[in-house]
Design a protein with these regions (language model features):
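Conserved acidic catalytic loop of the alpha/beta-hydrolase fold
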Residues: 74-96
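The feature captures the conserved acid-bearing segment of alpha/beta-hydrolase catalytic domains
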Residues: 127-270, 274
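Gly/Ala-rich beta-loop-alpha elbow adjacent to hydrolase catalytic centers
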Residues: 100-106, 110
């Protein structure tokens, strides 16, 4: 879908398709049967430290000799740094923008990576005058990392701390990767070692170019893939949700993805003093459900990737 979106954009602007370079990293899990020497992540919901979409380190068993690990966030930073280095070396002289786009689980890692990326350090090391803009595009994620413990109240619509009764039955609802607390799960090492801590990360997050994308029809509130996941309800479902996560930490954000995206957007305004950061925007694409192809090839999707 990214390739087709790039083709549409270059064609409409009279440019060769070679003007766009697409990198598509795959974060593998043990079930994917990765080959020797391939990083993989222990993607177990009950052990959040292994989840690649939350910046976890790769499983040390992927490196039997030395047990070295790599954070999924580090992997993305290295990709970005390699592109910047390519421009500095003259291999990518026309590079002007890097867009990190992800849908569903991919959208989750993109939002969280934007919070704890170290790419500013890399850009400063290479050359601060490279003049390459970087943007993050989280699309239709099932959950977000909230920046404080408040959520949108389902009844009043106000942004507030959840009730004591909810907190009692959903211990650690704001722990990583749903929030930045460490009550239930600690922050991954890559995040915990962020210079200046979480407060500094939240402050920098306001300066990121964030383009949140939501399908206007991504409103299925259950999971039709019954019994396949440990983090979803085993309810009958007649609509298309493609793995909607339904833990209490997920559902305090809303019943379905579109609601969760809008609620998260509302909480951003509260975190940053009454208004969302100017470099952040939310687009709802009409007549699109949980479908990456339709979303990225939409007018709104192409504009988010290639527009101003």
């Amino acid at each position: 879908s990214g390739i087709e979106a790039a083709k549409k954009w270059t064609a409409s602007n009279g440019l060769p398709s070679e003007r766009v370079v697409i990198l598509a990293p795959r974060f593998m899990e043990k079930v994917d049967a990765p080959g020797a020497g391939t990083l993989w992540w222990n993607n177990t919901e009950l052990e959040a430290r292994g989840i690649w979409r939350g910046g976890a380190d790769s499983d040390p068993r992927a490196d039997p000799g030395k047990h070295r690990v790599v954070s999924s966030f580090t992997a993305l930073d290295v990709l970005i740094e390699s592109l910047l280095a390519g421009k500095k070396a003259g291999r990518l002289p026309m590079l002007s923008r890097i867009a990190l786009a992800g849908h569903s689980s991919g959208g989750q890692i993109i939002q969280r990576h934007a919070l704890f990326t170290r790419i500013d350090e890399a850009a400063a090391r290479l050359d601060s005058t490279l003049n390459v803009s970087i943007r993050h595009l989280p699309a239709n994620p099932s959950s977000y990392c909230s920046l404080d413990g408040k959520r949108v109240d389902a009844k009043s619509g106000a942004v507030a701390t959840p009730s004591a009764s909810f907190v009692a039955r959903c211990a650690g609802y704001n722990s990583w990767h749903f929030g930045t607390d460490a009550e239930r799960w600690p922050l991954p090492p890559r995040c915990a070692s962020f210079p200046g801590g979480t407060k500094a990360a939240v402050a920098l997050f306001a300066t990121r170019t964030m383009k949140y994308m939501q399908g206007g029809n991504d409103t299925c509130a259950c999971n039709q893939e019954r019994g396949q996941y440990e983090n979803v309800r085993d309810d009958p479902c007649t609509c298309e949700s493609h793995g909607l996560e339904t833990t209490c930490s997920d559902e305090i954000g809303g019943s379905y993805r579109l609601m969760r995206g809008r609620n998260y957007w509302k909480t951003l305004g509260e975190v940053y003093g009454g208004a969302q950061p100017p470099s952040h925007s939310l687009s709802v694409v009409p007549n699109v459900g949980h479908d990456h192809t339709l979303l990225w090839q939409s007018t709104e999707g192409i504009a988010a990737i290639f527009g101003a």
